[in-house]
């Protein structure tokens, strides 16, 4: 019977399945809420839910509110980490930021104080991302951001736009991040000035994207930094592999262990409701997505961890239904 069910599932159009799953999970947004502690993020429609899945040959399937623009927030930490490694080299970066998961909140300061010498645990938490922002090449926030934008343009084929209202909203409420930055400056992990670093970090978080954009980045990472549509290596292979490992172990805030265990794909979330995920080619032996894929999801209602509530449900469902886990 199981074999018959599997044969039947092969005949079902993945696009139709995605549409059905999106509409099934959309009402669950009522159990979460948008990140209204950042005023500009609290203005969105919480019931939005969309997904885009991109394959190496350029085939794209999507459903729901897939073309809605949103700010990358913590998804951008993957990009800044890649940019820092490409410009400074992996040893230089890892001398300043570790690769260990932490059970603390993403904006916590406690481990910086109790674990000397105060090295941030990983680049996916705010302390680590601030440190990364400070070591991007350039003598000013403008130059550092220009380098970051150039990396983004290489990946998605267009220069990212900054959502000025979100940036201003975060700038005016960045009290915890300022505290983190000053502590990192005092312990000599922050290489730029505090306000300069904050500008870089908050503007990278305010970069606008769609599910298609982050699905493309996920696809490139799935292929170890190789852009399968442009047939070009755009991220060094060792950097891409390290970024994927960090996404798997640290990418979903304090729920990273749960996602690794029950979803089983590298993923990175942001408090705006985005999730960037990927399935490497080696993960599947049959369709769909036998050649790997990138996944972009948007659902602004977030859970207690800061992850998209409906987006996480959708990702878990499709990973289990299509057996996408890398384990």
UniProtKB/Swiss-Prot annotation:
Statement: the UniProt record of this protein carries the keyword Hydrolase: yes
Coiled coil: none
Any matching Pfam family: Glutaminase
Superkingdom of origin organism: Bacteria
Keywords, in A-Z order: Hydrolase
GO terms, molecular function: glutaminase activity
Record: residues binding substrate: 74, 126, 170, 177, 201, 253, 271
Catalytic activity: L-glutamine + H2O = L-glutamate + NH4(+)
EC number: 3.5.1.2
GO biological process, one term: glutamine catabolic process
Keyword DNA repair: no
InterPro entries: Beta-lactam/transpept-like (IPR012338), Glutaminase (IPR015868)
EC primary class: hydrolase
Known partners and oligomeric status: Homotetramer.
Family assignment from sequence similarity: Belongs to the glutaminase family.
Name of the protein in its database record: Glutaminase 1
